[in-house]
Every structure is written in structure tokens, then in C-alpha cells.
A protein has these predicted regions:
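Conserved phosphate-interacting/catalytic interface
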Residues: 39
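Low-complexity, intrinsically disordered Gly/Pro/Thr-rich segments
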Residues: 155-164
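Active/ligand-binding-proximal structured segments within catalytic/core domains
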Residues: 13, 23-35, 43-48
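Short, conserved catalytic/metal-binding micro-motifs enriched in Asp/Glu and His
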Residues: 29, 159, 174
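M16 family metallopeptidases and their MPP-like homologs
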Residues: 13-16, 45, 49-98, 103-154, ...
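Single conserved hydrophobic/aromatic residue that forms the stacking wall/gate
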Residues: 1-12
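Extended, charge-rich low-complexity interaction segments
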Residues: 21-24, 33, 137, 152
């Protein structure tokens, strides 16, 4: 048996999240996209990777099930940068809890998420899976226009409320894989 030396530390910060039937899940999806979504402009990517070069990859993800949900922030970093990365991550979460988004920030975030959804909807397999999942959960089909309308209806107050419910440090668990 040969054990490999792992230089990097893998981090996971997580919390339970809204289930698939909770109306607040749309606001959390938008917050998730702003915080650590696939765009290079996500807040965690800018804070940890672009400004400081502390991580190669940082992302957050959200999964909603019928009875619960899961929210997770993931990144890998060098052992000496773990504390700095954690402090910066919690600083971004606090910023999302304390500062209401401006109307231009909110509009840009909505536009980005809707754009990502539209691009994903060009894939027939993604469309079929999405329709099947929606029908199984809700016994109805929501087309792209309905989803976009739900995102467009979100307000800065909605996001602030959800950020305060979801991103409080006392509810988050941190796992460091060595």
C-alpha cells in the first residue's frame, strides 16, 4: 500500500437548504449563482481566485429534493491558505447577509442566470430531464418563460431575507479534507 501525499486541502462548507416545493428556492438559486455559480464573475471566484490566486477552482451548488435541500461551497487550496480562504468566504457570506443588492447588480445577476438557463435549454437532453423532473415533482410542466418570470419577480429584499436565513455562520458546517 502506497499512500500519496496530498498537498492541497479540499474544503466543503455546507448547510441544508429549501426543498423543491419552497417558494424561496428560486431566490436561493439566484444567490447561489451570484456567490459561486459557473460565471467567472461569481463573488467567491473573484475574491479567492482572481484577486488573490488562492484557489484554482471555487464553486457553490444547490440541490433541492422533495423533503429537503443541500447547499455547498467547495474549493481546494494550499494548507497555509486554508484560514485565509475560510475568512474570505465567510466575509462574502456576511456581505450577502448585510448588504442589499443595488438595482443594477440585481438586474445583471438575473440576466446572467436567465442566460445560463436559456443556453442549457438548447440541449434536448437537458430539456427532457428538466421537464420530467418538473412533472414528477409538481405534476405540471413549467416552460422556460414561467421560470424566467419567477426569476424576474425576485427583489433585493427577497435575496436579503434568504441570505440571512441560509448564510448565517452558526448554521454552516465546514469539512476540511487533508
Amino acid at each position: 500500500l502506497h499512500l500519496l501525499s496530498r498537498r492541497q486541502r479540499q474544503m466543503c462548507i455546507r448547510d441544508s437548504a429549501y426543498n423543491a416545493y419552497d417558494d424561496k428556492r428560486t431566490a436561493l438559486y439566484l444567490l447561489n449563482n451570484i456567490l459561486g455559480g459557473p460565471g467567472m464573475n461569481s463573488r467567491l471566484n473573484v475574491a479567492l481566485r482572481e484577486r488573490r490566486g488562492l484557489v484554482y477552482n471555487v464553486e457553490s451548488n444547490l440541490t433541492s429534493y422533495t423533503d429537503t435541500g443541500a447547499f455547498c461551497i467547495y474549493f481546494g487550496t494550499d494548507p497555509e491558505d486554508v484560514d485565509t480562504c475560510l475568512k474570505l468566504t465567510y466575509k462574502e457570506l456576511k456581505r450577502m447577509r448585510d448588504m442589499k443588492m443595488t438595482s443594477s447588480q440585481l438586474a445583471a445577476a438575473k440576466k446572467q442566470l436567465i442566460g445560463q438557463i436559456c443556453v442549457a435549454s438548447d440541449n434536448f437532453e437537458n430539456n427532457a430531464l428538466s421537464m420530467a423532473k418538473t412533472f414528477l415533482h409538481y405534476n405540471k410542466f413549467e416552460n422556460l418563460a414561467v421560470v424566467c418570470k419567477r426569476i424576474e419577480a425576485l427583489t433585493a429584499d427577497d435575496l436579503l431575507e434568504v441570505a440571512n436565513e441560509m448564510f448565517a455562520e452558526e448554521y454552516l458546517s465546514t469539512l476540511i479534507y487533508r
